């Protein structure tokens, strides 16, 4: 594991790239009680065209698919990942930006179990027709919430006016 010391911050960061390409970073915080874990992937709202692994042809997916998948990843075969984190005494969340989707947890107990749960649920997707319909309603409510936020509207209005042809204009 590579050890990187940042003199100005007085912090040591550990980094390892696994055989499967996953990059792992650890930042020990002496004197802190809470553990924070985050899994991030380079797939965000602007990623609407790409060549799938093992294929040669470019495909186009629906706008909003990254945000939709962010929500659906929490659906596990035997329940909901957020509920499983809660059983371990952890809080969990996720977010999608224009270039990334991230899943995270924070906890003061069961750190190893939380890391295992995080790595497990982000690697399996369980979608049913029923869960898709349910998610449509949840995402519609989120959109309405953002539409009521003046700061959000100004920001995305500016982005849409600056980037007429780029997918960053679509949240």
Task: Describe these PLM feature segments.
Residues 11, 32-34, 98-100:
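Extracytoplasmic
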Residues 2-15, 159-171:
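Histidine-acidic residue clusters that define the catalytic metal-binding segment
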Residues 77-171:
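Acidic/histidine-enriched segments that form metal/cofactor-coordinating
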Residues 27-29, 95:
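Short beta-strand micro-motifs enriched in acidic
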Residues 38-110:
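M16/MPP (pitrilysin/insulinase) zinc-metallopeptidase core fold and M16-derived inactive scaffolds
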